[in-house]
Amino acid sequence: MPEETQVHVVRHGEVHNPTGILYGRLPGFHLSATGAAQAAAVADALADRDIVAVIASPLQRAQETAAPIAARHDLAVETDPDLIESANFFXGRRVGPGDGAWRDPRVWWQLRNPFTPSWGEPYVDIAARMTTAVDKARVRGAGHEVVCVSHQLPVWTLRLYLTGKRLWHDPRRRDCALASVTSLIYDGDRLVDVVYSQPAAL
């Protein structure tokens, strides 16, 4: 009889980013005080779950989000590079409306194709590595629950892929808030449900 396994894919908490840059994979970006509180709220929400492993992206903000979750279950945080943030040409720049990056003609070529996208890691590659990460976690925690801490675009791309939706999308419409939990519920190796929650929401 197939076992039920749950993989809880958590987005990291709020990051201390006073200059408002797109930090991507850059080192040194840690959780803000709010982000630490969000991570603690997720740890509280998952405290009574049957969690046997906590696995995180190698980036600091993901490791810091994973730490209180792992501590609640007397586990060490494990690291999986497949959970890392997506690569992005604009990492290290301000890219909001009216900011310099968009007004620089030298970068316009990077914006030519929103479907791949041309400015970063292809969606299909993100989906492939995130699926690999989740499959490893599911096998590792068969019959139990596992937490994987990652980043907004990888988590959202994974969800689109697993639910059979197109991968290109409007970033403003991602249903993946800070410190949110996307729970993947498996019957054996078959995905039977996806449940989204925001335990850290105010």
UniProtKB/Swiss-Prot annotation:
Short name of any one Pfam family annotated for the protein: His_Phos_1
Any one GO molecular function term: phosphatase activity
Cross-link (Isoglutamyl lysine isopeptide (Lys-Gln) (interchain with Q-Cter in protein Pup)): 136
PANTHER family documented for this protein: BROAD-SPECIFICITY PHOSPHATASE YOR283W-RELATED, PHOSPHOGLYCERATE MUTASE
Regions crossing the membrane: none
Protein name, per record: Uncharacterized protein MT0547
Presence of the UniProt keyword Ubl conjugation in the record: yes
Keyword Ubl conjugation recorded: yes
UniProt-listed InterPro entries: His_Pase_superF_clade-1, His_PPase_superfam, PGM_Phosphatase
A Gene Ontology term for the protein's cellular component: cytoplasm
Record's keyword terms, sorted: Isopeptide bond, Ubl conjugation
Source species of the chain: Mycobacterium tuberculosis (strain CDC 1551 / Oshkosh)
